[in-house]
Amino acid sequence: MSFKPLLLSLSLLSPALGVAPRQSASCRAIPGDPEWPSTSAWNALNNTVHGRLKATVPLPSVCHHEPFGTYNEDACTALKTEWLDDRTFLNNAAEVMNPGTQNYSCVPFTSPSQPCQLGNYASYSINVTGADDVIAGIRFARQKNIRLVIKNTGHDFAGKSTGTGALSLWTHHLNTTEIISSYESAEYTGPAAKLGAGVISGNVYQVVAEAGYRVMGGTCPTVGLAGGYTSGAGHSLLNGAYGMAADAVLEWEVVTAQGEHLIASQSNNTDLYWALSGGGPGTFAVVLSMTTKVFQDGPIGSGIMLFNLTSDNTEEYWGAIEDLWAFLPEFVDAGPNTWDFALTSTGFQAYAITVPDQNGTQVKSLLQPWLDSIEKRGIQYSYTPTDSPNYLQYFSSRFGPGIAGAGPATVQLASRLIPRAAMYNATQKKVIVSALRAFIEDGEDLELGCHALNVGNIEHPGNAVLPAWRNAIATCNVVNYWDWNITATEMQARKDLLVDRLIPGLEEATPGSGTYLNEIDARWKGDWITELYGDNYDRLLQIKNKYDPEHRFYAWTAVGSDSWFTDGSGRLCRV
């Protein structure tokens, strides 16, 4: 096979292009360092993994004259549209759907005369087909002292699955789904599904539905279930029925940093099972597959509800929102229910009121106490009941069939868990609603999306899910969208507003709570050990040190990451 792409990438970050020399032997090597592997070393690794090593040539290289020589004006024009769609990134080894992480180093919207630099891209990727590929990649990274990252779909708000000069273990093509009609263990007997690490929500819902089941997964169909989603805890429209996605895990198939191919379950390698089930992705081991409970399918009752925010009803509108928060505990306690709603500058939308095994009319009856309060405030609303015979049809009606409902690749978000106890304290509730109101009134077209749930009373195995989830009434995301039509300085100002003012305001309004570790901005400045892991952190770090004593796996804000920093050239260095 041709190794031309390998040779191209080796020169991209040479010292002649401004990369500072490495200052310490405690840093991972990057291109341009004397220790960077030779072409023959990369070719040898490629032979070891049977031709599945790929040098990174960013998709937007077609928009730039140098250094790849792939400029194509027509292809670039098409890519400018495709770049806004999540699906563009799924089947490309090194791409991540996160404009902040892309960092303007090689994007379709900058001048063709600007060189296409790798920046935060991994330098090489192994298309993983099994444990042997992972073991080969880990061994090479250790021998050559280079950074190692784990990537699945690239659905990654925090930039954990890429890094300057990294070798990426790309698990996207481990995409098999096996239905197990009667899984048996000491802890559980019942239906399950074994999901390869590359399986995404939009596909697995279809497969399990055909077998008569439903499974917890993300609301974005491009989310990989057996990767960061579940290992980060995993919120779902079905949380009210079955707990967090991590609560349903039966076993993990992994390769550790020491090259061991293991099964982690409640009876084997139990500490690793505990850590992987909620303790965060990219740091304990490389997941090859996950076996999870699936659940008998059935109807889903729901409804779509809207009312407007106008200059004439501002105070009554926010009074209705405060009434909603007071009502949410009653709603989520009334059954296996969740409620996804959005607040924008134009009003309120409840787009996914999820009540398993009920119908839309029954759902409205559940909502009636709050609807009565809205009517008393003189607010006109619309409510449309919906009935779905199964979960797949329900999900598709809200988010699109398969991956057709994939969202924009321009989403920027940060999140916060809202404590349930605050809903019983009028003062605390007002403080929280005031913080949410600030997002809408001060946030320059920000949207606020909340997912209401109760996972505190659902039986679950011991795991590393952040304890604050068990005490939360909702998780709320603050969302805006990257605008490629404004300057980088203007876009940076929007990010500054989000991470420097608005999110800290919500954190101040919810002391002692926490944050969903999968939904943080790459520039988030919170106390990540406390906010993302809570009291679990010390035990998680012990497990990290046991299975990865050299800290070969690194991801920003992952367990153990406080032992590292990135220098001005992007090298990963020991503190």
Curated annotation (Swiss-Prot):
Domain of life: Eukaryota
Bridged cysteine pairs (disulfide): none
Pathway(s) of this molecule: Secondary metabolite biosynthesis
Usage in biotechnology: Calbistrin A has been reported to possess a number of interesting bioactivities including antifungal active against Candida albicans and cytotoxic toward both healthy and leukemic human cells.
Residues annotated as signal peptide: 1-18
Keywords, sorted A to Z: FAD, Flavoprotein, Glycoprotein, Isomerase, Oxidoreductase, Signal
Xref: Pfam families: BBE, FAD_binding_4
One of the record's GO molecular function terms: FAD binding
Residues carrying sugar: N46, N103, N127, N175, N268, N308, N359, N425, N485
Record-listed E.C. numbers: 1.1.3.-, 5.5.1.-
Regulation: induction: Expression is induced in complex medium (Czapek yeast autolysate medium) supporting calbistrin production. Expression is positively regulated by the calbistrin biosynthesis cluster-specific transcription factor calC.
Domain FAD-binding PCMH-type: from-to ranges: 118-297
PANTHER family named among the record's database cross-references: FAD BINDING DOMAIN PROTEIN (AFU_ORTHOLOGUE AFUA_6G12070)-RELATED (PTHR13878:SF91), GULONOLACTONE OXIDASE (PTHR13878)
Function in brief: Bifunctional decaline synthase; part of the gene cluster that mediates the biosynthesis of calbistrin A and related compounds. Calbistrin A is a secondary metabolite with an interesting structure that was recently found to have bioactivity against leukemia cells. It consists of two polyketides linked by an ester bond: a bicyclic decalin containing polyketide and a linear 12 carbon dioic acid structure. The polyketide synthase calA is probably responsible for forming the decalin moiety.
Similarity annotation: Belongs to the oxygen-dependent FAD-linked oxidoreductase family.
Name of the protein in its database record: Bifunctional decalin synthase calF
